[in-house]
């Protein structure tokens, strides 16, 4: 019996193969009468059966390769129309339909379109040529379909002639949003632009940048490829290879092209992520071959095949790797499930598809559900109505769950929305018309209403945008093996408006994170602290990793360039992942060098106080009086005290006050000190000047108080102008790489140099006067000269050191110079006198000083007599003779008188003198 059934089935198939399309009605897949007819285009069969490479006669060939999933789409349209007819949406108006099989061929779809455009209620079924189709009444009012963009474009160009509404449910090519080219086309799915943008976002988010892409050789595939290239570049993703497969299975080269594509995938070992824009039958063949070649990759699925049960049920499909895809947003299609349960109730005479399906079920009656789809595909031919209704019912009852398993929820919902959109538009159009009359309106009128209609699926409201698209978004799906079967699970949603993935729960987040474990990169990932250095390759994704230089950082992987730290406040070492705050530095109080300098300054202050006490207690002694008196000594000691104290303003955190105070305090006090010493040098020069004219001039010049006030006043003016016009301020020095130096900016180098230069001029004058007054056995001038030399040596050394020193120790250099010059002058001015006061009290008496003066006078006169000399200060040259000779010249006598006058002047002025009677070793220190 079973053998007989199989024999009869084979006979029917052979008979059907030999029966081409004889009449237009044979061409219709399903039909139902109504007041308003809606056309439908579905690729129910995968290809046309032709014995020739190219047709020789213009006839429609037989179609083979029955597709269960598209058969279900056809049923979804029928079900949606029946839902409207059974509702109150169009009271008294029945929607009918004519559904045609495109066989996945443009030519077949265009043939069906010609029948749609044929004149209504005309027996000849002709398409009339007119200059104006405004009043032309075609066979149908609108068309739903086709599924593939390539076919939809061709059909739409024909429908544009009459502006007949065409609502796509699966055609996603971006070009279809162009209302200039396709003014009558609308669709209930988003444009591919959004899908491709979401894919590029997913790839970038997962850390992949080296991928492959496979498309079809048609308008849809080429447009998708071009758009993806643009989005990939925007997301820094590189395409390692691009493979293009023939668009139709009838192409004899498809198997060769698939093999070449798989070999390319094997060669590109670093490419582990492949984007696939193919039709279901392409993917079916591709994956079967990939399983044979043991290829395991991550596949990014487009909405064409991401939820296709035909592919998920391929044996050992798990061996291909992981699949993440994008599917149309799901809706409530529970009523469609009930419709499938009662599929046998449809009238069989007008649904040839049901007869063909019944035939395939009979041929595959003993095949398991898992293999049933492939069995039907292999045995599919154009069906003849030879089965009884009772047999059909029995088969449907046996396999109704099988159909539901192959339903793609997103596509079913899109078809429902397409029918509902037309239904609501017809309702709005028929409110003032009698739509039971087929001539109530023209297709172009329906198009105008359809563009602005708001419709619902029972749960949500929808409307078309300005491009005729329905931006419902996408579901992101992941293929997972559950109980040994590959199952399509929803992983996330993609929000078109905000370009974000909406992840519902933590488990899904973990699945997203797991995608990052798959590596698909041309180059190894650059770690934080490194940047990408592009190689000679044409792809920016192929690069080398280079360490970030100093003061640069990267805190993420694969950054294209290193970020610059703020050089003013931060720094970074080589290969740094972050910037570090610069340490603020200045000559701090706890710095070892600062402590040492402070100790030296404090010792200097103590020494000044000790000297002041010694001089105060020995106020009336000749040594103190010969130093110019207590007032002059106190002024000099006060200046030294201020100089030592001024060093404290060079230490610690700089402030505007300390910056202004330290230089002016030192400059004025040191100038006052030098001015006082200058008057002493001038007095010594006056005391030992024997030229009457010079002596007279020096007497006129010698005005101690005026000299001190004038010299100091000039310095005060210099410092005042300095503070007014260019005062020293705190400066944040950021030129060092790792530290910030807080320092005092002198404001004006010219003013600073003028202040120091003026002190140097006074010191030089003082040095000249002291050097000129440096007489034998009179050590005051010698010590002043030595003190000035110390000052000059210290400050001459200071200039190059100060100019080349950088950092927080610049103030320390100036402190050291101040201490050296201050100690030098203080030592030379007061140490010899303190030595006499403390250690040689026997010569610190008036009688001892007078004795030394007379002794020096006698010695000086003897020296003049014994040593021939020319006295240029006299009116003529006089030769000195021995004073013991019997005759003393007048000239010699005159010199003696002048010498006596000089020492008398010294006594009157309380000038110091060192006795000749002291031993040489003692005198040298006084």
From Swiss-Prot:
UniProt GO MF annotations: G protein-coupled peptide receptor activity; G protein-coupled receptor activity
Membrane topology: Multi-pass membrane protein
Residues carrying a glycan: 121, 259, 332, 378, 452, 555, 567, 590, 733
Cytoplasmic topological segments: 616-631, 691-704, 770-782, 832-926
GO cellular component: cell surface; plasma membrane
Similarity-based family: Belongs to the G-protein coupled receptor 3 family.
UniProt GO BP: adenylate cyclase-activating G protein-coupled receptor signaling pathway; calcium-mediated signaling; positive regulation of insulin secretion involved in cellular response to glucose stimulus; regulation of testosterone biosynthetic process; response to amino acid
Domain of life, per lineage: Eukaryota
Annotated compartments: Cell membrane
Transmembrane residue ranges: 595-615, 632-652, 670-690, 705-725, 749-769, 783-803, 811-831
Record protein name field: G-protein coupled receptor family C group 6 member A
Tissue expression notes: Isoform 1 is expressed at high level in brain, skeletal muscle, testis, bone, calvaria, osteoblasts and leukocytes. Expressed at intermediate level in liver, heart, kidney and spleen. Expressed at low level in lung, pancreas, placenta and ovary. Not detected in thymus, prostate, small intestine, tongue and colon. Isoform 1 and isoform 2 are expressed in kidney at the same level. Isoform 2 is expressed at lower level than isoform 1 in the other tissues.
């Amino acid at each position: 019996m079973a053998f007989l059934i199989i024999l009869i089935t084979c006979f029917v198939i052979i008979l059907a193969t030999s029966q081409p399309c004889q009449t237009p009605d044979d061409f219709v897949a399903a039909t139902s009468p109504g007041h308003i007819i809606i056309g439908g285009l579905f690729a129910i069969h995968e290809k046309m059966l032709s014995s020739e490479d190219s047709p020789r006669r213009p006839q429609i060939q037989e179609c083979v390769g029955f597709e269960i999933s598209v058969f279900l789409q056809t049923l979804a349209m029928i079900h949606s129309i029946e839902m409207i007819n059974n509702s109150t949406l169009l009271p008294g108006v029945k929607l009918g339909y004519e559904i045609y099989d495109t066989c996945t061929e443009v030519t077949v779809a265009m043939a069906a379109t010609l029948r749609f455009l044929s004149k209504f209620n005309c027996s000849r079924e002709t398409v009339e040529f007119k200059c104006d189709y405004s009043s032309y009444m075609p066979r149908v009012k609108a068309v739903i379909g086709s599924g593939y963009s390539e076919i939809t474009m061709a059909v739409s160009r024909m429908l544009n002639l009459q502006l007949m509404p065409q609502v796509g449910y699966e055609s996603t090519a971006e070009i279809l949003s162009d209302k200039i080219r396709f003014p009558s086309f609308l669709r209930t799915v988003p444009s591919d632009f959004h899908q491709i943008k979401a894919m590029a976002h997913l790839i970038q988010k997962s850390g992949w940048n080296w991928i492959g892409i496979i498309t079809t050789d048609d308008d849809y595939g080429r447009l998708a490829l071009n758009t993806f290239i643009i989005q990939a570049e925007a997301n820094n993703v590189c395409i390692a290879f691009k493979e293009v497969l023939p668009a139709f299975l009838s192409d004899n080269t498809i198997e060769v092209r698939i093999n070449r594509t798989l070999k390319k995938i094997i060669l590109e070992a670093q490419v582990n992520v492949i984007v696939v824009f193919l039709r279901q039958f392409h993917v079916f063949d591709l994956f079967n071959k990939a399983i044979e070649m043991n290829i395991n990759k991550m596949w990014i699925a487009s909405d064409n095949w991401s939820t296709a049960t035909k592919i998920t049920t391929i044996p050992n499909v798990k061996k291909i790797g992981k699949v993440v895809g994008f599917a149309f947003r799901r809706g409530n299609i529970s009523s469609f499930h009930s419709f499938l349960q009662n599929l046998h109730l449809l009238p069989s005479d007008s649904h040839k598809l049901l007869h063909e399906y019944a035939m395939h079920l009979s041929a595959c009656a003993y095949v398991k559900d898992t293999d049933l789809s492939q069995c039907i595909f292999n045995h599919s031919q154009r069906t003849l109505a030879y089965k009884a209704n009772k047999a059909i019912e029995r088969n449907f009852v046996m396999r109704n769950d099988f159909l539901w398993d192959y339903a793609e929820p997103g596509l079913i919902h899109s078809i429902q929305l397409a029918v509902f959109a037309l239904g609501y538009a017809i309702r709005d159009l028929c409110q003032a018309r009698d739509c039971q009359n087929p001539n109530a309106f023209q297709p172009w009128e329906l198009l105008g209403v359809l563009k602005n209609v708001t419709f619902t699926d029972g749960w949500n409201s929808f409307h078309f945008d300005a491009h005729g698209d329905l931006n419902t978004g996408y579901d992101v799906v992941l293929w997972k093996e559950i109980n040994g079967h590959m199952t399509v699970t929803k992983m996330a949603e993609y929000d078109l408006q905000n370009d974000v993935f909406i992840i519902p729960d933590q488990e899904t987040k973990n699945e997203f994170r797991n995608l990052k474990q798959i590596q698909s990169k041309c180059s190894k990932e650059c770690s934080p602290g490194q940047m990408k250095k592009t190689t000679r390759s044409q792809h920016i994704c192929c690069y080398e990793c280079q360490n970030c230089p100093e003061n640069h950082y990267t805190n993420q992987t694969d950054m294209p360039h290193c970020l610059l730290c703020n050089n003013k406040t931060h720094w970074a070492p080589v290969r740094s992942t972050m910037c570090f705050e610069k340490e603020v530095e200045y000559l701090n109080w706890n710095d070892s060098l600062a402590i040492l300098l402070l100790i030296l300054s404090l010792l200097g202050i103590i020494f000044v106080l000790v000297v002041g006490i010694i001089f105060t207690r020995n106020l009336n002694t000749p040594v103190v009086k010969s130093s110019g008196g207590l007032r002059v000594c106190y002024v000099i000691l006060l200046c030294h005290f201020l100089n030592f104290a001024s060093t404290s303003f060079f230490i610690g955190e700089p402030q505007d006050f300390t910056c202004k105070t330290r230089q002016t305090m030192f400059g004025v006090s040191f100038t006052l000190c030098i001015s006082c010493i200058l008057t002493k040098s001038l007095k010594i020069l006056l005391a030992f000047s024997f030229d009457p004219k010079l002596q007279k001039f020096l007497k006129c010049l010698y005005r101690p108080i005026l000299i001190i006030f004038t010299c100091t006043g000039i310095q005060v003016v210099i410092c005042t102008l300095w503070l007014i016009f260019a005062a020293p301020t705190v400066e944040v020095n950021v030129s060092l790489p790792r530290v910030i130096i807080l320092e005092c900016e002198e404001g004006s180098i010219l003013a600073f140099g003028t202040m120091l230069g003026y002190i140097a001029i006074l010191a030089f004058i003082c040095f000249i006067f002291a050097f000129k007054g440096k007489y034998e056995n009179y050590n005051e001038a010698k010590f002043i000269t030595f003190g000035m030399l110390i000052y000059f040596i210290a400050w001459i050394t200071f200039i190059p050191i100060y100019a080349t020193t950088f950092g927080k120790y610049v103030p320390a250099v100036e402190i050291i110079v101040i201490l050296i010059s201050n100690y030098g002058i203080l030592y030379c001015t007061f140490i010899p006198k303190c030595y006499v006061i403390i250690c040689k009290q026997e010569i610190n008496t008036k009688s001892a000083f007078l004795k030394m003066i007379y002794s020096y006078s006698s010695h000086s006169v003897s020296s003049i007599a014994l040593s021939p000399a020319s006295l240029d200060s006299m009116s003529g040259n006089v030769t000195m003779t021995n004073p013991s000779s019997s005759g003393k010249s007048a000239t010699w006598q005159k010199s003696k008188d002048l010498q006596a006058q000089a020492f008398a002047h010294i006594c009157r002025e309380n000038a110091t003198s060192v006795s000749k009677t002291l031993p040489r070793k003692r005198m040298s220190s006084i």
